[in-house]
Amino acid sequence: MSSTFTDAPDLPLPSSYGDPERTGLGANDLFEGISEHLFFTLGRRVDNASPHDFYLALSYAVRDRLTSRQLASQDALRAHERPRAVAYLSAEFLIGPQLGNNLLMLGIQAEAATALQRFGIQDIEQILALEEEPGLGNGGLG
């Protein structure tokens, strides 16, 4: 019988798991995270990156921070003997753009604005406005 990931002992964590540029909430950490994603994820240098590139790099940097916290929450949940979860899904609720909400939930709106200012982007709203509404249509049913 093959072993599952939960059976495997001492699985290694990615080397960037605790790096501030991946998980830190400060303006410098976000600046480094955005820089890393511009170059390594998007293949862009700062001097030729478009506003959309900065939107994507900021989104990836925020996702890094959310992912590390999500995994910590899952670990805490698994530590309980009988974990329980409640989920609610409404087909009538449109979630809208998420980057601004995620910045708010992490409490890093000002830090993100400061990080973007270091790239010469004075108004974070210009970057947030680039996010498209999630495609949650009703299939023409109403």
Please identify what each model-predicted range represents.
Residues S2-G142:
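A conserved ligand/cofactor-binding region detector
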